[in-house]
Structure formats: structure tokens, C-alpha cells
Amino acid sequence: MSEAFLLDKRSLGYAEDYVPAPDHVRAAREDAVSAGVPAPSNGVTTALTFLAKVLDAKAVVEIGTGTGATGLALFEGMSPQGVLTSIDPEVGWQLTAKQAFRDRQIASQHFRLIAGRPLEVVNNLRDAAYDLVLVNAEKLEYVEHVAQAERLLRPGGVLVLNDALWH
């Protein structure tokens, strides 16, 4: 199956540009590219904001912090009382994300940045306590992340697997 059959470049461009990202989300994506960190597309960040808003998400788990672009997009849609728990083994990326959150005046009680192997860390999170789980991590571990997400999500919660069709 050819890529053109799935979505031509004009359609993809239109979809990506239809809803512009807020400046701070765009800046975090640019920081990711500069740092050599995989950066989410505008379409991904817009979809995350939409999902968090529709769910009125108060508790979100993000597996794969990156430079904070996806976290910022989630905060755009989350409840003002919401808490983002973001897990990543790369402390440096988390420091960049933390600064991005602070630059947006997101109070520290609204985010938890946990450094460590995600599959080990999620074992310590509460069952059925989260509205949304975003997995943006090592693709070869997605099967295990899905199993953990099933445990973490409340009834009606949403699992997002970024780049699930990557291969």
C-alpha cells in the first residue's frame, strides 16, 4: 500500500495546519528538534489538547516526557485542577519540560516529573485513577504499556499510543 493512497501530502499539510498550535507548544516542539528529541507534530499536539478537553482530564499519565511539547498540549485541554504525571528515563529532557511548564506559570502541584524506566515506575501508580494515558515511549515496549494503561485508566478513560503505526 503506497503512502499516497493513505494520505497525500496536501491533505496531510492541510490537517497539520488547520488548527495552529499555541506559541509555547510550537516553541517546545522546536526545542525538541534542536535537541534531537522526537518532536510531536502539530496534529498530534492538537489532538491531545482536544482529547484532554473532551475528557475534562484531571489526572493524566504521560510516558515519555520529551521536552514538554506533549505535556503543554495536554495542559491546554486539562481541567485547571488537573495533574500530569510524566515519566521519562532522561533527566535532561525532564528539566527542559519543567522549565517549559514553569514558563507557562503551571504550578508545581499540577505536575509530577518522575525519572526512571517507565515500565518500573508505572507499577507504583494507582489503579483506575487516570482519565488519559499517553504512551510516547520505546515502541518495542508498547504491548507492556498497553497492559499497564488498562490497569491505570478509570472506566471511560482514553489510551493514546503515539506513533502506533510507525512501523
Regions found by a protein language model. Give the residues of each.
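Short, basic/glycine-rich phosphate-binding loops at helix/coil junctions
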Residues: 25-31
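Conserved SAM-binding loop and adjacent beta-strand
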Residues: 17-20, 33-47, 53
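S-adenosylmethionine/decaboxylated-SAM
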Residues: 42-167
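Amphipathic alpha-helical segments within well-ordered protein domains
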Residues: 11-16, 29, 49, 98
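N-terminal auxiliary segments of SAM/dcSAM-dependent transferases
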Residues: 1-22
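A short, structure-level motif marking secondary-structure boundaries and short turns
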Residues: 12-15, 32-34, 82-83
